[in-house]
Amino acid sequence: VLLRSRLMHSPCPTLQSTSSVLVGFAVALLLVLNGCTPRETPVEAATRSGTLLLGNAAEPADLDPHLSSTLTDQIIINSLFEGLTVLDEATMQPLPAAADSWEVSPDGLTWTFHLRHDLHWSNGDPLNAADFVRSWQRALNPALAADNAWYLFVLKNAIAYNSGEIANPAEIGVTAPDAHTLVLTLEHPAPYLPALLSLPVWFPLHADNLEKFGAHTQRGRPWTRPGELISNGSYTLAVWEPNARIVLEKNPQHRDAAHAQVQRIVFLPIENPDDEERAYRAGQLHATFTLPVTKITTWQKNAAAQLRIDPLLQSHFLRINTAAHPALADAATRRALSTAIDRELLARSVLQTSRAPATSLVPPMGDYLPASIQSEAAIRQNGSGNMPHVVPPPKLELIVRNDSLMPRVAEALQAMWKTQLGIDVSITQLEQKTWVQRQQTGDYQLCLSAWTADYPDPLTFLELFLSDSPYNWTGWASRDYDALLARAAHTSEPAARLALLREAETLLLDEAPIAPLYFGAETRLVYPNIKNWTPAPLGFRRFQLLQFAD
């Protein structure tokens, strides 16, 4: 985060921005805040009113917790809703949230959660255990077709209900014996369950509010709009102006409302990181979502106290569509694309050492020893790194998100593949929504992609490439891989479980439907008067814990 010394600020009445988004925001923001005096920046005026101004990179696709799939959507959703648990930002360990305690049976198959007695929806209605039961049944309903339903598959009969094998949702392994108790019965032991329960797909929804707008499994209904959304988190939805701003107001019904100093949060969907950095310098943001790598050195030299480079449990990789081109159906071709990549050079020259090169999909975490692709030297020595003889050589397309980093990484890969393999690769830049859609529909050959851990366990990365995973957009499927993860799921001894996960990762890297590139880092600018901004390896923060310095 940039250390600010004598950076120039635009006075409040004549805000200057570099895009129509920021111009629209500057005008709208003045209506949200209580006004600002001459020479006062939006950040200064916002601080006086307890308003936090945040860059958030992209317009939300959906604020339905059961349907959201992007980090930028879920950052907002996590402020609107709350599950049974929440993860500590720094340690990633589960903490009590809607539940104040829980216990597990000796066989690891039955978990009992005890809800707090002071839970309310934002409209004042009491929130009880039955709300969680109905919400999880909704998330698993095949009519909703929620991609994230798979996170609930640890529940007994969840897969059977989601697949239509059974029709009665009461057979799913969750019951509410009373208003403040939830009993979860699992298909297999899941020691990571308390962390898993912090994900948005496990959040409760106000059933009557959903049904007011039609069947609760209908998508795109207006219950997620301002004035209609009923939530249970620290904030409520006050304003949603598409492509301009989302404003959250403190929820007075939340159990910890009295302790939250941040009264209001304004999220700005500024997709261009250069525009976002300029907005920060102009005093329009308390914190950016990211920072162009080309600006890191400048901020390190001139304003290091405002520059934050924090570890992120995130993996960036090349996604290969094995069904998109005959050459890509060959594992030898995919391995050649991977081994032609000089990851050290990529990290040093393109990423300016802000990210670590990756030779595995899973970042280092806990007691897990990640698998690793072979070194380039070893692969070339045994000949497995050569491009299979294809006449003519394939001409491939690489799709990337149009941010400040992916195109630069793509250009480096393009040059490496041309030099090492003699193949031509074109680069197509896309805005985030289209970039995601083309991966989902298989409309790509090569793609730069990334995954941020949902919970602190290797499985959060490895389960992406199960044959039936809704996020396995590679066209690759392996019964052996599926079997290894299934064995790990039923293995209670920690070391043996991790060994099976490592074996699965080794198989994945050898088959190469993906090629690891580098591990993520959260690179931001944070205004000096924001207190309690701690590293968050999973990318989420409880904004209600932040404070404004005097």
Go through the PLM ranges and name each one.
Residues 128-135, 179-185, 233-234, 262-264, ...:
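Alpha-helical secondary-structure segments
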Residues 352-392, 402-408:
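Structural transition elements
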Residues 158, 169-171, 175, 179-180, ...:
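Gly/Pro-rich hinge or "lid" segments in bacterial periplasmic/extracellular proteins
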Residues 100-151, 183, 276-279, 327-329:
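Aromatic- and charge-enriched surface segment that lines or borders ligand/interaction sites
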Residues 238-249, 266-324, 348:
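Extracellular/periplasmic solute-recognition and catalytic clefts
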Residues 55-106, 137, 228-231:
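N-terminal lobe/hinge region of extracytoplasmic solute-binding protein
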Residues 524-550:
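Long beta-strand-rich cores associated with HINT superfamily self-processing modules
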Residues 37, 335, 347-348, 423-435, ...:
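Extracytoplasmic/peripheral linker and loop segments enriched in polar/acidic and small residues
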